[in-house]
Regions:
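Elongated, amphipathic alpha-helical interaction scaffolds
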Residues: 1-292
Length: 292
């Protein structure tokens, strides 16, 4: 893992820490969604930044708006080819969390899942890809209140998005040296100040070091049989996704392998995959070990 002082906003830990400032988070959401948001509440309940004792934690950003809308934002620096299914899962998790608290499904709020990608997830050269549910035959909107947005730092259609969004994505793509340059944008400047403040915070540095130790111990010791969630950068949604997270650190994971892992429902089999992934030094070795 990158040293604390060398982190940029594209790092999940740093991104989550910066976005815990409600003004930073609200500014991002308004820029991406292109409508005003009066007030938001950023959830830190399960964030390792505030609760480093947790395993199975989140390093994405979860926020609630004044109108009860829910927002989930995640930084992605590697193309794992599972983002569409991941977005579907995030929407369902938000809905289930709300329903579990007694809300009728008819009163479900609008949900927005946003991925900020340091790559082009679809290959069309867009800075922004927006997905809504529509009727295949008529093109009519379903209006189910769920929207998924993928941002890309590799966009080439500058005239189709705001200057602020382009500069923000340029900041996301910047390496440690370039990230301190002046992007001539007030919002980016506010993010740069937040990054500097976080890096000067000794407690935040200690929490990041603890995260490094947790991940290092997890890799070295393998997967404890009693653990069902695991930890990883970004939200890890159970054993199957943890296997894919581990494998992606070793190399490119084919759609065939990732689909087979996600389709596996046998807990014992998933545990075997986890153990194999934690010990493998390549995706090919994992494939041979598991027969996938």
């Amino acid at each position: 893992m990158t040293e604390f002082q060398d982190l940029t906003i594209s790092n999940n830990f740093m991104f989550a820490a910066v976005m815990e400032d409600t003004e930073n988070c609200r500014g991002l959401l308004e820029m991406v969604l292109e409508f005003p948001i009066a007030r938001i509440e950023v959830s830190t309940e399960k964030s390792i930044i505030h609760h480093p004792q947790y395993h199975g934690v989140r390093l994405d950003v979860y926020a609630k708006g004044d109108d009860s809308a829910r927002y989930n934002v995640e930084m992605q620096v590697r193309n794992k080819d599972n983002l569409p299914k991941r977005s579907r899962y995030y929407h369902s998790q938000i809905d289930m969390d709300i329903i579990a608290k007694g809300t009728d499904y008819k009163e479900l709020p609008d949900t927005y899942v946003i991925f900020i990608c340091d790559f082009d997830p679809f290959g069309f050269g867009k800075y922004k890809y927006t997905f809504d549910m529509i009727c295949t035959e008529t093109g009519e909107m379903l209006d189910d209140g769920a929207r998924t947005i993928f941002l890309s730092t590799k966009g080439t259609n500058g005239s189709e998005v705001s200057e602020g969004l382009r500069k923000f994505l340029g900041y996301v793509a910047a390496d440690i040296a370039a990230s301190t340059e002046d992007f001539d944008d007030d919002y980016v400047r506010s993010l740069q100040k937040s990054v500097s403040r976080i890096k000067s915070d000794r407690e935040m540095g200690e929490r990041y070091m603890l995260l490094k130790e947790l991940l290092s111990d997890e890799r070295a010791e393998g997967i404890n049989e009693g653990r069902t969630e695991g930890i990883a950068i970004g939200r890890v949604r159970g054993k199957a996704e943890f296997v894919i997270e581990l494998l992606s650190e070793l190399g490119e994971v084919s759609t065939e392998i990732s689909d087979a892992i996600m389709a596996e429902k046998d807990p014992a089999r998933l545990l075997a995959y986890l153990k194999a992934a934690s010990k493998a030094d390549s995706v090919e070795k994992f494939r041979k070990e598991t027969g996938l």
